[in-house]
Curated annotation (Swiss-Prot):
Protein location: Nucleus, Nucleolus
Molecular function via GO: RNA binding
GO cellular component term of the entry, any: nucleus
Region of interest: Disordered: 1-53
Domain KH residue range list: 158-215
PANTHER family registered for this protein in UniProt: RIBONUCLEASE Y (PTHR12826), RNA-BINDING PROTEIN PNO1 (PTHR12826:SF13)
Bias (Low complexity): 27-40
Annotated protein name in UniProt: RNA-binding protein PNO1
Alphabetical keyword list: Nucleus, RNA-binding
Function: Positively regulates dimethylation of two adjacent adenosines in the loop of a conserved hairpin near the 3'-end of 18S rRNA.
Amino acid sequence: METEAADESGFTSVASKRGRRKRRAAGAEPMEAAESAEAAGPQPSKRPAFPPLPAAALGVGKGEVRKVPVPANRYTPLKENWMKIFTPIVEHLQLQIRFNLKTRNVEIKTCSETKDLSALTKAADFVKAFILGFQVEDALALIRLDDLFLESFEVTDVKPLKGDHLSRAIGRIAGKGGKTKFTIENVTRTRIVLADSKIHILGSFQNIKMARTAICNLILGSPPSKVYGNIRAVASRAAERF
């Protein structure tokens, strides 16, 4: 059922006659073309060319929803700052937002006017940052800039501390009157929230890395003066590099 033809390099190419016989019988393929194609061997298939999809076909405006749970201690701040949160999400990102009183979730939904695919993710990150304890003005940077991220970890992830030892570690991160935390924020250009034993950092990837290293050193017992010197040296090297 199959024919074998030897080419110049000595390799044997195998071609099937079944499909060609049917096409010959139907008159769709002339005898000469079939014989030449048979002698040449199997032809490589061409890559398909697909046109780019329009935004309407990518699912924009089809009612995608993101839900951000709100803990009880953030109800009052959310109510007081609702218009500051509502305005940029609705006017700039063209999304719909509401607070569901039954499920205690902030629900963000796309609509027919939504043009940007990443708007829903930006809005959800913005609301999440506020719920974690960041100021609205700081959290707004997540909407304006694309290279900002949120990172969260616990003190016990760095060192398994309990009782007074855990309290002292948290106090070392904050410093007297918040001095240590503010110094780390200013040098690394980040924003830090201390919520009990949880630590939330907002900033660019490289700056988050510097702030996280400084906080971990404080938890592990390094004196604050040494930590200040280390992060200032790292920050100056990074500034020279860029």
